[in-house]
Amino acid sequence: MSSKVQQEIADLKKLIRKWDKEYYVDSLPSVEDFVYDKHILRLQELESKYPEYKTLDSPTLKFGSDLLNDFKEVEHSAPILSLDKVYDLDLLKSWIDKIDFNNSFNISVEPKIDGCSIVLYYKDGVLEKALTRGNGKFGNDVTINVRTIRYIPLFLDEKVDLVLRGEVYITKENFLKINKFLEKPYTNSRNLASGILRRVDSREVANFPLNIFIYDFLNAGLEFKTNDLATARLKKLGFKVNPLIRFFDLKNSIGEVLNYIADITKKRDSFEYEIDGVVLKVSDFALRERLGYTAHHPKWAMAYKFEALSGFSRVNSIVVQVGRSGKITPVANIDKVFVSGAFITSATLHNQDYIRSIGLNVGDVVKVSRRGDVIPAVEMVINKFSTGFFKVPDNCPACKTAVVKEGAHFFCPNNNCPSVAVERIKYFCSKNCMDIEGFSDKIISFLFEKKFIFSEIDLYTFDFYKLLEFKGFKDRKINNLINSIEASKKKPFSKLLLSMGIKDLGENTIRLLFLNNLNSFSKLFKLCQDRYFAFSTLLKIKGIGEKIALNIIEAFNDSVMLNKFKFFENLEFKMEEVVAIDGENKLLAGKKFCITGTFNGYSRSIIIDKLKNKGAIFNTCVTGSLDFLIVGEKAGSKLKKALSLNIKIMSFEDIKSYLD
């Protein structure tokens, strides 16, 4: 047992040292922070359990070093420590709860910039030197390069001695621009900023648009009582401080702190710079000293780290998938990578034009994102190891029919394509449509492959007890499937209409139809028999354009689609849905809304549901076609955009009467 533990500790040390060099020296990390931290925690766990195997060279006693031989090493005036970190909000709250504020709650919150740490030393108001963090005791002297950063004042108006910590960064936009011209592109903006700062020729550094935020005033405690006062002084002296830093005191609660963190987390994609978390610090300098330090980090600060929104992986193969509309979508099979809290092994490539634009082929190393919890997608090629780019095949992979191009996408035109058929059934059963419980993609594919079902109507005629002969299907499971099918017959007509998969017909358009007295199968069918009259009628409805109008008319003249509707009508499905709009609710009926901010006592989802039930239509983003923006506390960028577009603003008080 002891030899196994020793070996695991030795292996962990070796691996962590390798990663430290990649991160701090080479600026080319091969693993995400989350993976690195997991290995550090495992090493700490083993060393705590078996202290006899803990050595003085353990990575848990130190933090990584960015020292390079190209620059002179200079000793810091005081240890430049790292930050303790958590990935869980409950752990963050526990850290806050443990601090004895002595009835004087004070804490600051600011984004954690993903850049290159720097320490600035001012003597009598003059920038004397600039050092990298290095190993915390010694740093590389990069003063000559730092002097080229326009946002760092070389001379101050006051003759003061300062020791400041800041984060040198490069904006997302400039990262993409610069990376295009580099022979060896960087994987992220942090590595690029770090690489630029360490260039030997300062004239080269001056050509790059480096930026900086000052986030710590290391000798502020000698002059100020709290961090907010010190920060105000820094601004007055001409230093750039992140405008998103916020100070909380007795008037605030921990809940408000957590809400602000949630707000930053939500908006991080809109920032011009990369952030990898949020930093919390005790504001009171006297309390900081009482809380003290470890050899690694101050006890008065904590970083809440985000799980990675993107990762880097190699494309092993590319397959094409056929959707319910026949659309051909290329998908990359990639090495497993951890992104946004999940391991992913595949990512969409959108379409042929997109593949061509990024020059992607099998074997390339790519950046993969999973922003907003959507389907993982390949963002860009990081390292090109192939020639040319992948080409979508000329024929559908499922039925071999020649594909046709419509806009940016290729489509399989065969209505009887097996892939199209099975995807339509999956869509019909999905949560947003008929929500037929128990019918997973796996079960639907199984039923289709065994030729038990060929379309959604077969779900209502198939004898499910035939499944008893197959492994995994027993009476209870089969009865649950049958009960789910029966329950689906009671779903409202809007759900059935959505489930039919009419191209571009979504929930909002269906609501518009219903609000304009087109709220039944018979009304829609009758209207669409006169194509020209139907087209002009539909175009009169605000929010319905030519494309959607033509798709609706085509659907209600398609024999296959009509046979499906007749089938469901014979099974006594609901073929009409009453939309009652009284005089009081006419303001909402058919109007397009968006919502932003927080609302005391109400979640946004509850407000949306209640207003939808009274005829409102909700968009997820602010566009020129919006009628109203509902604004709560701590409204974000949506409010700014709405004001620029002259969109009417509604407060919580304006809509409160509609929520009863």
Curated annotation (Swiss-Prot):
EC identifiers of the protein: 6.5.1.2
Binding site residues for NAD(+): 33-37, 82-83, 110, 133, 167, 281, 305
InterPro entries in the record: BRCT_dom (IPR001357), BRCT_dom_sf (IPR036420), DNA_ligase (IPR001679), DNAligase_adenylation (IPR013839), DNAligase_N (IPR013840), Hlx-hairpin-Hlx_DNA-bd_motif (IPR003583), NA-bd_OB-fold (IPR012340), NAD_DNA_ligase_OB (IPR004150)
EC main group: ligase
One annotated GO biological process: DNA replication
Entry coiled-coil feature ranges: none
Gene behind the chain: ligA
Pfam families: BRCT, DNA_ligase_aden, DNA_ligase_OB
Domain BRCT: start-end pairs: 583-660
Protein name, as recorded: DNA ligase
Catalysed conversion reaction: NAD(+) + (deoxyribonucleotide)n-3'-hydroxyl + 5'-phospho-(deoxyribonucleotide)m = (deoxyribonucleotide)n+m + AMP + beta-nicotinamide D-nucleotide
Cofactor section: Mg(2+); Mn(2+)
SMART domains for the chain: BRCT (SM00292), HhH1 (SM00278), LIGANc (SM00532)
Record NCBIfam families: dnlj, PRK07956.1, PRK14350.1
Family membership: Belongs to the NAD-dependent DNA ligase family. LigA subfamily.
Active site: 112
Residue numbers binding Zn(2+): 396, 399, 412, 417
Function text: DNA ligase that catalyzes the formation of phosphodiester linkages between 5'-phosphoryl and 3'-hydroxyl groups in double-stranded DNA using NAD as a coenzyme and as the energy source for the reaction. It is essential for DNA replication and repair of damaged DNA.
This protein's UniProt keywords: DNA damage, DNA repair, DNA replication, Ligase, Magnesium, Manganese, Metal-binding, NAD, Zinc
